[in-house]
């Protein structure tokens, strides 16, 4: 199977990737198991030194990695650069604090001596999303590897270029072969990977549907699972709020990463006394945000990561309007680009109220 990486801003193909064969996949899983035998015995000090080196490589090559993020999923370059720097920070943070985090903790029981100790469990599968293609991986990988585990990455298929770069960073840092590996595979192979005796756990960040499917597989094969799923967060504004401050916060909370975040503010619940003022100022603020080529440093709003994602958002907008929502701003779509959109008078029963909206849509309630 071939996977294509496509620039969502202009539709140009960036690269093509061939899926691993079943034999190649099993070989990588077995390599991870072999690497675990040595990695778990590697001193914590050595592991910390290597993760610190990962942080240095991220910092030194931040612009190169940020450009790949922007090309593959359309994030404005300024945000991509911030993402890479945050990845360096998380590596430094865990490397500096690993000793404290992994130290034994004495606890009181009826026994003469009781304590909690931390031991690695083996190979961990990471199923990661496209919206923060570097951050989601490094916030998993740094603590996982420092704890003595090995990792297999199954990234979203539209950001395989980022995934390849991430694996290369660990190689350049001197992390032993097999400790961190990227798998170019279809999501249909998830059960094959999870069912393998070498894989002890899975960490997934993604949709509720994906999480439900992976949790079921983990349960079937009695593997540990850690899930971070979607959200439809409410942003509540009271009548005594500083409206200007609330609007400034709301613009960032809704529009960061073009609204493609599980923790983004999506539904704005406004008390009657400040509804008009907030909506007016929020609309004015949104109109000042610059849309355009995400590689340009002053661009604030780029395309969504894929055309089908923009199509889905457009469907949610139209259905909400059909059910009585008022279009206050935007509403248009061209390919992967969706205009920043504000809907007013949003009520239960509308997609803008009931569903997670993964894009630049603000629902005023």
Where are these regions (language model features)?
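Short glycine-enriched loop/turn motifs at secondary-structure junctions
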Residues: 9-12, 49, 177, 196, ...
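ALDH superfamily catalytic-core signature
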Residues: 209-347
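Short, well-ordered beta-strand elements within core beta-sheets of diverse protein domains
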Residues: 15-19, 35-41, 126, 235-238, ...
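Residue-level signal for inorganic ion chemistry
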Residues: 11, 47, 69, 91, ...
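Structural signal for hydrophobic packing residues in well-ordered secondary-structure cores
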Residues: 33-36, 40, 55-62, 66, ...
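Rossmann-like NAD(P) dinucleotide-binding subdomain of oxidoreductase/dehydrogenase enzymes
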Residues: 103-245
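Well-formed, non-transmembrane alpha-helical positions, independent of function
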Residues: 143, 192-193, 249, 319, ...
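N-terminal Rossmann-like NAD(P)+-binding subdomain of aldehyde/semialdehyde dehydrogenases
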Residues: 1-112
């Amino acid at each position: 199977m071939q996977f294509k990486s496509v620039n969502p801003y202009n539709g140009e193909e960036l690269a093509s990737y061939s899926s691993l064969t079943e034999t190649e996949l099993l070989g990588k899983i077995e390599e991870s198991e072999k690497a675990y035998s040595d990695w778990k015995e590697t001193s914590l000090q050595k592991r910390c030194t290597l993760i610190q080196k990962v942080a240095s490589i991220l910092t030194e090559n931040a612009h190169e990695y940020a450009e790949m993020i922007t090309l593959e999923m359309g994030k404005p370059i300024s945000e991509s650069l911030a993402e890479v720097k945050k990845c360096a920070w998380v590596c430094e943070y865990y490397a500096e604090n690993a000793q404290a985090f992994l130290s034994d903790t004495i606890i009181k029981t009826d026994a003469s001596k009781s304590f909690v100790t931390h031991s690695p469990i083996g190979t961990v599968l990471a199923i990661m999303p496209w919206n923060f293609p570097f951050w989601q991986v490094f916030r998993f990988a740094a603590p996982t590897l420092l704890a003595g585990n090995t990792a297999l990455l199954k990234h979203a298929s539209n950001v395989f270029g980022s995934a390849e770069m991430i694996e290369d960073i660990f190689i350049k840092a001197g992390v032993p072969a097999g400790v961190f590996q990227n798998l170019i595979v279809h999501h249909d192979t998830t059960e094959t990977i999870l069912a393998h005796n070498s894989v002890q756990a899975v960490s997934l960040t993604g949709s509720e549907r994906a999480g439900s499917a992976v949790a079921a597989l983990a349960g079937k094969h009695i593997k540990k699972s850690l899930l971070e799923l979607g959200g439809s967060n409410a942003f509540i504004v009271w009548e005594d709020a500083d409206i200007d401050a609330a609007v400034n916060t709301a613009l960032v909370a809704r529009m960061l990463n073009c609204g493609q975040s599980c923790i983004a503010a999506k539904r704005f619940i406004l008390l009657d006394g400040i509804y008009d003022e907030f909506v007016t100022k929020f609309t004015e603020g949104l109109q000042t945000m610059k849309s355009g080529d995400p590689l340009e440093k002053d661009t604030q709003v780029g395309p969504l990561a894929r055309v089908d994602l923009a199509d889905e958002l457009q469907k949610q907008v139209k259905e909400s309007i059909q059910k009585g929502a008022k279009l206050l701003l935007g509403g248009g779509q061209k390919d992967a680009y969706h205009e920043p959109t504000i809907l007013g008078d949003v009520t239960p029963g509308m997609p803008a109220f009931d569903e997670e909206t993964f894009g630049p849509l603000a629902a005023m309630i």
